[in-house]
Curated annotation (Swiss-Prot):
Listed EC numbers: 2.6.1.83
Chain positions found as N6-(pyridoxal phosphate)lysine: K249
Summary of subunit composition and partner proteins: Homodimer.
Designated name of the protein: LL-diaminopimelate aminotransferase
Gene Ontology molecular-function annotations: L,L-diaminopimelate aminotransferase activity; pyridoxal phosphate binding
Species whose genome carries this gene: Leptospira biflexa serovar Patoc (strain Patoc 1 / ATCC 23582 / Paris)
Binding site for pyridoxal 5'-phosphate: Y72, S108, K109, Y132, N187, Y218, S246, F247, S248, R257, N292
Binding site for substrate: Y15, G42, K109, Y132, N187, N292, R388
Enzyme class name: transferase
Any GO BP annotation: lysine biosynthetic process via diaminopimelate, diaminopimelate-aminotransferase pathway
Similarity field: Belongs to the class-I pyridoxal-phosphate-dependent aminotransferase family. LL-diaminopimelate aminotransferase subfamily.
Length: 408
């Protein structure tokens, strides 16, 4: 009989969001008249902006003509989109990025999960705790993490706790880590990193010979002009960091699928013999081998995001979600909850009341208020006793959810 990859058996039972779905379904089946409000998974609710839709319609019509048909495109992405990405997201901030340093993909989740393939299995990873589960689970699948202990932590992962005590600003790894995962604005805590703190991270990575995997999927929600939107705003970051970006939350592409990864050519690793190798070239080889590229229609829609009218429309949507965040945050504070995040990110991180465990509060919130959120413990051991609410709901649902919570 063919053997399996036993690393999959090391995964904790059930991915966080399917488990939420299972519990919600069980409750819904037993309470069919319940009006459940979902503020859990970070899926957007507003439709695609008109400028994006029009661009995709035009692209679809192009594809229906002999002269405008596009078959396989460049796996790394079409130049028309990459040039807009560079001009808007980097050149405008004084950062120089070359076209062949940008890789367009169908989502940051895929990129964050797949990037570990170009690192040695001996590489030690460090993650902030609580953490987006994909960073950990994909390394478990690869065989890099060892076994999970009774405390929920994997033996070969360096955990960097982000707690109320350290203002959710984790200390540097206590032992050398080859790969450091950072996410700002942070999922799940909603916190951000200042320029001074990011500078410290870049300097630390240089000193230790580490690589930072910087997940910047929520940068468009930053309201404070003093907070960096890209790690490359920090001098020297191109020598130590890769950056993950997404159109999912920025422009409502959760169902359309488009993102990009920046890997500077200055970013190098080494072989066992000490030879330097470009991570850019390794990823290019991996990307072109395993990925056929994002569709032409989708990339034309993404290009429209950077048009003048496209920017107006997506900023209106971002403002809508951030107003939701404000309503959630203020409503929870009024109800007596201890709350974090929600000012430069679409996530609100709250302390569970009465010392409840995260899943206990999940069940209480669902059973009493018919509101669904995300248990903090699902993001790691340091998330126990916390809970995440998302600002991506419809306004009327957000208002109703807060009213229900305040009555609990």
């Amino acid at each position: 009989m063919t053997q399996i990859n036993e690393n999959y058996l090391k995964l904790k039972a059930g991915y966080l969001f399917p488990e939420i779905g299972r519990r919600v379904k069980a409750y819904s089946d037993a309470n069919q008249n319940a009006k459940i409000i979902r503020l859990g998974i970070g899926d957007v609710t507003l439709p695609l902006a008109p400028t994006i839709v029009n661009a995709m319609v035009d692209a679809a019509k192009e594809m229906g003509s002999a002269g405008g048909f596009h078959g396989y495109g460049p796996e790394q992405g079409y130049s028309f989109l990459i040039q807009k990405i560079i001009a808007h997201d980097y050149t405008a901030r004084g950062v120089q990025i070359a076209e062949d340093e940008v890789f367009v993909s169908d989502g940051s989740k895929c990129d964050c999960g797949n990037i570990q393939e170009i690192f040695s299995l001996d590489s030690k990873i460090a993650v902030v705790d609580p953490v987006y589960p994909v960073y950990v689970d994909t390394n478990v699948m690869a065989g890099r993490t060892g076994e999970v202990g009774p405390d929920g932590r994997y033996a070969n992962i360096v955990y960097m706790p982000a707690t109320e005590e350290n203002n959710f600003e984790p200390d540097f790894p206590k032992e050398k880590a080859d790969i450091i995962y950072l996410c700002y604005p942070n999922n799940p805590t909603g916190m951000v990193a200042t320029k001074a703190r990011l500078t410290e991270w870049v300097n630390y990575a240089k000193k230790m010979g580490s690589i930072i995997l910087y997940d910047s999927a929520y940068e468009s929600f930053i309201q404070d002009p003093e907070i960096p939107k890209s790690i490359y705003e920090i001098p020297g970051a191109k020598e130590v960091a890769m950056e993950f970006r997404s159109f999912s939350k920025t422009a409502g592409f959760t169902g359309t699928r488009c993102a990009y990864l920046v890997i500077p050519k200055d970013l190098k690793g080494k072989t066992k013999s000490g030879e330097e190798v470009s991570f850019n070239s390794l990823w290019n080889r991996r990307h072109t081998t395993k990925f056929n590229g994002v569709s032409y229609i989708t990339q034309k829609g993404a290009e429209a995001v950077f048009s003048a009218q496209g920017q107006v429309e997506i900023k209106e949507q971002i403002s809508y979600y951030m107003e939701n965040a404000k309503l959630i945050r203020e409503g929870l504070v009024k109800a007596g909850y201890t709350v974090f995040g929600g000012t430069n990110a679409p996530y609100i991180w709250l302390k569970t009341p009465r010392g409840l465990k995260s899943w206990e509060f999940f069940d209480e919130l669902l059973g009493t208020a018919q509101v669904v959120g995300t248990p903090g413990s699902g993001f790691g051991p340091a998330g126990e006793g916390y809970f995440r609410l998302s600002a991506f709901g419809k306004r009327e649902d957000v208002i109703s959810a807060i009213e229900r919570i305040q009555k609990m």
